[in-house]
Amino acid sequence: SERSRGLGDVYKRQISIHVDASKYSSTRGFSVYTLSERGLDREAEKVARLENSLSVFSKKGLKGVNLKKGRNLIDHHNINEAFRKARDSSFEFAEILVDKVSERSQKLTRPHRYAGFAVLKSPNYPSVLVELGFITNDNDRQNFNNRNWQSSIANKFVEAVNKNFK
């Protein structure tokens, strides 16, 4: 629809959904990951290096380089800022998601965790990686196969997304 096309960029989120496993069958519960500060800094530096190395010649000279100022147009500060905005928004969404999902599902002791997973490394939009529970736990595994549980968790995800956009 026209409305959804106009709002497309506003509503962009990446929610990567998984189930976890543990050598301990008693380990169970929901968790959500966002990019760690260390991962953020490393990723921003990689993007800056990559962007800075992609200058190519065109008819007008070296693309990506401001010949008057003698420096690359890719501003490291802007890259860092994009990562920080995405990370902050991801953090906010993760906190809301933990609150909503924990109304219907058990959560780990520290349900909001930090990692450097590839799916969390976009500076273009907020992203979270969700572990719904542990396939190695009987209770979690039963939940994964229960349509009522699936539906209630899906509804909690929708509530979290809606609350995040208010």
Task: Report residues per predicted region.
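Single conserved hydrophobic/aromatic residue that forms the stacking wall/gate
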Residues: 1-11
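Extracytoplasmic segments of membrane-associated envelope/inner-membrane machinery
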Residues: 42, 48-80
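Active-site-adjacent mobile loop/cap segments within catalytic or ligand-binding domains
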Residues: 74-166
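A short, glycine/acidic-enriched catalytic loop
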Residues: 22-57
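Active-site-adjacent substrate-recognition loops and nearby beta-strands
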Residues: 27-32, 49, 60, 106-118
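Structured binding elements
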Residues: 15
